[in-house]
Amino acid sequence: MKSPVAGAVLDPSTPPPTTGTSWRWPGLRDADPYREARLRMVEQLRRSGLVTSRRVLEAMARVPRHLFVPPEYRGMAYEDRPLPIGHGQTISAPGVVGRMLQLLDPQPGEKVLDVGAGSGYQSALLAELVTPGGRVYAVERIPELAEYARENLEKTGYRGVVEVVVGDGSKGLPQHAPYHRIKVAAAAPKPPKPLVEQLAPGGRMVIPIGTPDLQILTIIEKTPDGRVRERRDIEVLFVPLIGEHGYREDWRKQYWQWWR
């Protein structure tokens, strides 16, 4: 994924930190060797204006991203860049992750569907944001990655809040619907109908919509009376959402057929 090409206005209500990395975030352990790198990352995101939500920044300061990437990439875990996690997939850049969570705005006690679990990092952040009382259901189409996510969530203490399921994320998980929030970490040509249907009245979904080579982060909201509204945020680049209501496995051929 590439970095977004558009920025955001810094929220003037966000309190300024003290100098450097001495800003004390709640829930941090001084013994964590990656603590300073994680705080620097969070502070850089805050100063950029891309992520201004205090709750999201605090969650990102607590979740150890280095434990959700392969060991050979841990030295780069707190750079604002995507990293490979195997099977042709990536863990998204922290700035884009934070932006998505800020737009999604999950609250304690809510039920969230996380489409595209990957290594489990965003599911862990969602767990932080819906605790206490919330639940996260994460869908991953690649069995090996689903198991990798389970292992990562287990060792970081989030398995009690997050359930990882292997399946076609474009179909959602109707057995646990409706959801207060749905986050999709893969690009679709249009909002998948099952996901819109599984969104609760008053709920919100954040999903990248567009072609495989460029998308717009799109916020889809369902009003209390069931009407659906869309608004757009920033340009992003995600891997395609492979599935019945997304792109086909041979998405490159499918894409070029559209443009012939």
UniProtKB/Swiss-Prot annotation:
Superkingdom of the organism of origin: Archaea
Q: Return the GO cellular component terms, semicolon-separated.
A: cytoplasm
Q: Which residues form the active site?
A: S92
Q: What is its EC number?
A: 2.1.1.77
Q: Which enzyme type, at the first EC level?
A: transferase
One Pfam family name from the record? PCMT
Q: Does the keyword S-adenosyl-L-methionine apply?
A: yes
Query: Where does the record place it?
Result: Cytoplasm
Which controlled-vocabulary keywords does the entry list?
Cytoplasm, Methyltransferase, S-adenosyl-L-methionine, Transferase
User: What main location does UniProt list?
Assistant: cytoplasm
CDD domains of this UniProt entry? AdoMet_MTases
Q: Which reaction does it catalyse?
A: [protein]-L-isoaspartate + S-adenosyl-L-methionine = [protein]-L-isoaspartate alpha-methyl ester + S-adenosyl-L-homocysteine
Record has Protein transport as a keyword = no
Protein family (similarity comment): Belongs to the methyltransferase superfamily. L-isoaspartyl/D-aspartyl protein methyltransferase family.
Q: Which HAMAP family match?
A: PIMT
Which PANTHER family does the UniProt record give?
A: PROTEIN-L-ISOASPARTATE O-METHYLTRANSFERASE, PROTEIN-L-ISOASPARTATE(D-ASPARTATE) O-METHYLTRANSFERASE
Q: Which NCBIfam families match?
A: pimt, PRK00312.1
Q: What is the protein's name according to its record? A: Protein-L-isoaspartate O-methyltransferase
> Which gene specifies this protein's sequence?
pcm
